[in-house]
Amino acid sequence: MEPTPEMKRNRLPSMNFEAEILADPHDNSELYVIPSMRSLTAEEYVEAFQSFLDHSTEHQCMDEFNKEVMPHIMAGLGNGKSTINILGVGSGTGEQDLKMIQILQAAHPGVLINNEIIEPNPQHVAAYKELVNRAPDLQGVSFTWHQLTSSEYEQQVKEKNTHKKFDFIHMIQMLYRVEDIPNTIKFFHSCLNHQGKLLIIILSDSSGWASLWKKYRHCLPSTDSGHYITSDSITAVLRKLGIKYHVYEFPSGWDITECFIEGDPAGGHMMDFLTGTKNFLGTAPAALRSRLQEALCQPECSSRKDGRVIFCNNLSMIVAES
């Protein structure tokens, strides 16, 4: 049964990500989920996500990080060993993985690289394998895919008592969909070799997402795409675990101008991705549509450039020490 609009029960990010609290929706008290609104399926999410990538600088933002910071991280890996072990958690179709491998090869010429991948989506695994088949300069690099979720991988490791260690583990934009964030971070951190590094890429607290989620998540359908979290939630977990870390902030933008053009298909996909809702513009109450579109134009969410509305998609790159 839907909670009364006066007081909504929300799952909010906290140190343990477990406590449900009653949260006052403040001035949005008349806005709430109606039966016609539903969350995106996995396939619909992929389609909406592609629209996001097509109109955002997310990958360019990661490329800047790869250029400015990653060479220094990679140079410190391996501790003189002849083989460097990498684990990608939720690697998707592998584009970012291969870019990082190239940086590692440049930092450690001739070193063998054992790259393992945890990715539950079979389409993504197939696309990753195809990318590897087409890629040049992968001599000395081995690939092992685990078609599992991160929690399934953890369970398998514990059941078989095969706790393999890695020199570099990365979790790029995937912790939103993890059931138990603190224990997931704790487990994969325990998989690091001495002097290893854990890279977590997550939305920054300076992003428009942080402002949008604080005000409107109670108005949207619950989704198994997971937690509404930003970098502050992750660094709080790391501090509680006593893990040393450094945060690198990189600006990223997303052109959402089409969100405000009635009937625009790309704008519809963008609103679906923003809200995690299938056909948000066609199913949400008019008051919610209006309020959300108005919020997207506010300075805490977006800026204007050459007549376009650019949503703030800033990323935090968190590098944790072993």
From Swiss-Prot:
Note: Two different proteins belonging to two different protein families are able to mediate carnosine N-methyltransferase activity in chicken. This protein, which is not conserved in mammals, and another protein (AC F1N9S8), which is conserved from human to yeast.
Family to which the UniProt record says this protein belongs: Belongs to the class I-like SAM-binding methyltransferase superfamily. HNMT family.
Protein name as catalogued: Carnosine N-methyltransferase 2
Keywords: Methyltransferase, S-adenosyl-L-methionine, Transferase
Residues involved in substrate binding: 58, 313
Gene3D superfamilies referenced in this protein's UniProt entry, alphabetically: Vaccinia Virus protein VP39
Gene Ontology biological process terms from the UniProt entry: carnosine metabolic process; methylation
Domain of life of the source: Eukaryota
Complex and partners: Monomer.
EC number: 2.1.1.22
Keyword Transcription assigned: no
